[in-house]
C-alpha cells in the first residue's frame, strides 16, 4: 500500500487540476494550469504526504524504522518533525497562493527529499 500512495497522490493532482480547469471561468490559459498544479501539488504530495510521514515517524517509530531498514533512534524524531514542517507548509501553500512562498516551499522540499533519496 505504501508504494501506491505517492502514485495515487499524483494521479489525484492531475484529476483535480483538470476538474478545476474545466470548471474555471474563461479566459483559461497556461498560467491557470500552472497555478492549479502548484496548488494541488502543495496540498497532496507535499502537504498530506508530509503529514503522513510525520505520523509514521513520530507515532509509529518502530514500524517505520523496520520498514525502511533503520534501527529506532532519536533521528526518527528529527525526520518526523521535518516531515511535519514540510506537511504543514504544504497545506498552507495550497491555500496561500503567494508565488514566493510556494517557491520557497519547493526549494525546501526538493532539498529535503532530494537529500533523503541520495
Q: Where in the sequence are the language-model features?
A:
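Membrane-helix boundary/interface segments in integral membrane proteins
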Residues: 66, 86-98
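Membrane-interface helix-boundary motifs at transmembrane edges
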Residues: 25-41, 96-101
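Core segments of alpha-helical transmembrane spans in multipass integral membrane proteins
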Residues: 43-59, 74-91
